[in-house]
Design a protein with these regions (language model features):
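PLP-dependent amino-acid enzyme catalytic core
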Residues: 1-125
Length: 125
């Protein structure tokens, strides 16, 4: 993270869910394909999928701040809403289990743009 961005986050509570920087891999095959099309670019992939909690993913970056706020407020339960295959819901449940918070998921089986919406409620422990 650039120093100016780090400074902006300095006063915000955060719990460490990542354990250090995730690796960058150079996408040489994609670079070569683009070069054949006249685009000369260095392309790197940030491998947040290698974070060891709940299958990893970038959602853990925001959850570091959300969960720190929950803990700082003295709360013991998290409720979240999302689609049946929501990465946010999956990772929220994994983080709650890791830090000892109760978690309730409200999951939709259809797009929220169509009615009726069928929901499933899950309690994670």
């Amino acid at each position: 993270m650039a120093p100016s961005i780090q400074k902006g986050f300095a006063g915000i509570a955060r719990i460490d869910l990542i354990g250090g920087p995730t690796p960058l891999y150079r996408a040489t095959g994609l670079e070569s394909a683009l070069k054949r099309e006249g685009v000369d670019a260095g392309i790197y992939l940030k491998r947040d999928d290698l974070i060891p909690i709940g299958g990893g993913g970038n959602k853990l970056r925001k959850l570091q701040y959300h969960m720190a706020g929950v803990i700082a407020a003295g709360q013991d339960t998290v409720i979240t809403f999302g689609g049946l295959q929501s990465n946010h819901a999956r990772l929220t449940a994994a983080v709650c289990a890791k830090v000892g918070l109760e978690c309730h998921l409200i999951l939709t089986q259809r797009s929220t743009s169509t009615l009726p919406i069928t929901t499933t409620t899950a309690t994670c422990s």
